[in-house]
Amino acid sequence: METAPRERLRLVSSRQNAIVKQLRRSFSQGEVVEGYCAIEGLRMIEEAIRSGLKMRAICFSKSGEVKAERLLNQISHNVEALLLPDDVFSSAVETEHPQGVAALVKVRQSGPDELVSSSAPLILVAAGIQDPGNLGTMLRSAEAFDARGLILTEKTVSQWNAKVVRASAGSVFRVRTVAMRSPEMLEFLRGHKIQTAAAVARNGVRIQEFNFAGPTAVLIGNEGAGVPKELINRADHRICIPQAEPLESLNAGIAASIILYEATRQRSE
């Protein structure tokens, strides 16, 4: 006889419970802890399930217990299911207004070679992107426009930061991401004969006139300073998005989306 969803819930009242502590650490650090990242909210958890990610545990707040009926039917019985008092749940998550459900999901690790395994890969490089919303948008656009994946250089926010996960609308679970230092990244791309194009605000080749047909890596810099000068100087090309004066530049997420759209448009012709 099958167990009813709510009967699977185990009541835990201690903030020192191992799962509660791991959830808190992962949210507070914005990083993977022991191979798992913390995610919150019904939509994000269903995206993780849809993406085939494995879970260590799922936690419901007492006030969010009703969500168990919907979610536990989608999750293996091997996954621990905890019911937490509202104050214990709130102490573990990072949102100001907790959404009543959070989970520890096992992340997929991608290697650099996965980025170059197609004949003409299109790769996005996040060069020091610090705003979680921008990185989330870049991940979402990378999936939408069929980029091979993202390379995250030093000083880039973690893709497992809770705000990045939310902004990506689940794309972070499916898009390949690899962390590399800038010199290593350039050497890797050149070794695989992938042209590098640094996005600049002015004095670059207009993206409509640039040839994206071959293997290409597009470098997008952070919100304030743009692509670091040393990377611009070492990149094969400089590209820019035509825009009206006196606008100085677009934000990193929008710029990446426009460039990926143009690259995909050219490749589909």
Label each PLM-derived region with a short phrase.
Residues 41, 130-138, 248-255:
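Amphipathic alpha-helical repeat scaffolds
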Residues 103, 141-145, 154, 159-171, ...:
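Structured adenosyl-cofactor binding patch, chiefly the S-adenosyl-L-methionine
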Residues 1-70, 156-157:
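Boundary-proximal intrinsically disordered activation/regulatory segments immediately upstream
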Residues 197-247, 251:
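Active-site/ligand-binding-proximal alpha/beta "capping" segment
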Residues 10-14, 80-85, 175-185:
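Short acidic-hydrophobic, aromatic-tinged amphipathic segments that line or gate anion-handling sites
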Residues 73-104:
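Glycine/small-residue-rich loop that forms an oxyanion/phosphate-binding "nest" at active or ligand-binding sites
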Residues 50, 109-110, 114-203:
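RNA substrate-binding interface of SAM-dependent RNA methyltransferases
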